[in-house]
């Protein structure tokens, strides 16, 4: 990712300081920019297009309601490139989470999947600004096994977790085709 550019938005200066001091947040550069300010205002006013937009906006008591509105999701879609991806971290125990997922599905024309952690907690939702391809499950597994050997990673373990804990199920999802 040597050509990647990263912009981070954070409204709380204390969070930025903690990240710098305890999480080795890199210094700003031509490829890495930190904006201290309101993310919603930034999204509404920017002309930039992003290939990937991550939203992780928790407060002391959970996700602020303004980051779960149809307007917010539409604004996020608007700043994506044609092949951009929106990712949001939701809280699984919030009774409104299914409503938020449905809003994201509406905004992204059903081109969405989500992954739940093994234990109740976070739900990561992916919204795609393009039509998802239809994949053959066996071809995906074959490629993952090759990559496992090449990189000494347990990719099949993660693939199986993804299938188990996500909205993607090869047997009934358009993302996967059985042979």
Residue ranges of each PLM-predicted region?
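Generic domain-boundary/flexible-linker signal
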Residues: 17, 64, 97, 135-138
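C-terminal substrate-binding/active-site "lid" region of AdoMet-derived donor-dependent transferases
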Residues: 70-134
């Amino acid at each position: 990712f040597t050509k990647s550019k990263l912009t981070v938005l954070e409204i709380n200066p204390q969070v930025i300081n903690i990240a710098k001091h305890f999480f080795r947040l890199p210094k700003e550069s031509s490829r890495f920019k930190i904006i201290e300010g309101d993310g919603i205002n930034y999204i509404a006013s920017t002309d930039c297009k992003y290939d990937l937009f991550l939203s992780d906006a928790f407060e002391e008591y959970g996700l602020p309601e303004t980051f779960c509105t149809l307007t917010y999701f539409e604004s996020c879609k608007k700043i994506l490139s044609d092949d951009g991806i929106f990712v949001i971290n939701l809280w699984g125990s919030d009774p409104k989470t299914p409503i938020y997922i449905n809003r994201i599905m509406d905004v992204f024309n059903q081109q969405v999947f989500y992954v739940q952690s093994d234990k109740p907690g976070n739900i990561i939702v992916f919204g795609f600004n393009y039509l998802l391809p239809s994949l053959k499950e066996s071809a995906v597994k074959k490629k993952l096994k090759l990559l496992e050997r090449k990189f000494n990673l347990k990719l099949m373990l993660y693939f199986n977790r993804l299938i188990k804990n996500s909205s993607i199920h090869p047997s009934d999802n358009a993302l996967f085709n059985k042979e």
